[in-house]
Swiss-Prot record:
Protein's gene: trpA
HAMAP family the UniProt entry points to: Trp_synth_alpha
Native source species: Pelobacter propionicus (strain DSM 2379 / NBRC 103807 / OttBd1)
GO molecular function annotations of the record: tryptophan synthase activity
Protein name: Tryptophan synthase alpha chain
Documented EC number(s): 4.2.1.20
Length: 267
């Protein structure tokens, strides 16, 4: 069974929700990323999203854009990310999802990417700028290797798009809680509950929600409505502000506070 599927099944049995943490692979370098993955799991993360750095991250706000720039400056490539995941898998089995843009995957080759990612131990992939209606070739290769492809939905997604994502997506659906780019927000949308209920009526896979979640209270509020909550920019910001042991301590403290705030998630 795919690690993502197993993770959501286990969380449901425990009556809690998934904490999904996003960091950029290679920020500040891949050695740090490799060390951070088990640290995130130990602090309470259930699923790790690894951002694949890209030179034109159109959906990302300044925090993740700067993170991508730092990773690219450290010579981070898709091939090196997969080698790092392969090394992580020697001792850590936390579900790992690669998230990013289509261009690097297209350049790598769909079949080669699906094969190499699956062999490295990647469980899922989310391509921000790949509409599900245009994903057939990529999906064929990914599904053949049990590489679960997730898609984004937003508050402006049509019923037709929701139905298509429900038919084609696997692993989970990533619901974007706000329109615009990534980045911390002050509060959770008051309409989120109704929006998620509309999606849930048409979707059978778990729904995780993210974009803008930066505090334990926000994480708790979103987790009460979704199957999981994604925290990205607020975590990535720590990589800009800290390094070394201080970074490890700050990441551990922040992730543990998120996990403890989620209903049923206290250690």
């Amino acid at each position: 069974m795919n690690r993502l599927t197993h993770c959501f099944n286990e969380l449901k049995q425990r009556n809690t929700k998934a904490l999904v943490t996003f960091i950029t692979a290679g920020d500040p370098d891949l050695a740090t990323t490799q060390a951070m993955i088990p640290l995130l799991q130990q602090a309470g993360a259930d699923i790790i999203e690894l951002g694949m750095p890209f030179s034109d991250p159109m959906a990302d706000g300044p925090t993740i854009q700067l993170s991508s720039e730092r990773a690219l400056a450290a010579s981070t490539t898709l091939e090196r990310i997969l080698a790092m995941v392969r090394a992580v898998r020697r001792s850590c089995q936390v579900p790992i999802v690669l998230m990013g843009y289509l261009n690097p995957i297209h350049a790598y080759g769909y079949e080669r990417f699906a094969n190499d990612a699956a062999e490295a131990g990647v469980d899922g992939v989310l391509v921000v700028d790949m509409p599900p209606e245009e994903a057939e070739s990529f999906l064929n290769h990914a599904n053949a290797r049990d590489l679960q492809v997730a898609f984004l939905l937003t508050p402006t997604s049509t019923d037709s798009r929701i139905a298509t994502v429900g038919r084609l997506g696997r692993g989970f659906v990533y619901y974007v809680t706000v329109t615009g780019v990534t980045g911390a927000r002050q509060q959770v949308s008051t309409t989120l509950g109704g929006e998620l209920a509309k999606v849930r009526a048409k979707i059978s896979v778990p729904i995780v929600a993210g974009f803008g979640i930066s505090t334990p209270q926000q994480a708790a509020d979103v987790a009460a409505m979704a199957d999981g909550v994604v925290v990205g920019s607020a975590l990535v910001k720590l990589f800009q502000l800290h390094s070394g042991e201080e970074l490890r301590q700050e990441v551990t403290r922040f992730v543990a506070s998120l996990r403890q705030a989620i209903p049923g998630g206290a250690a």
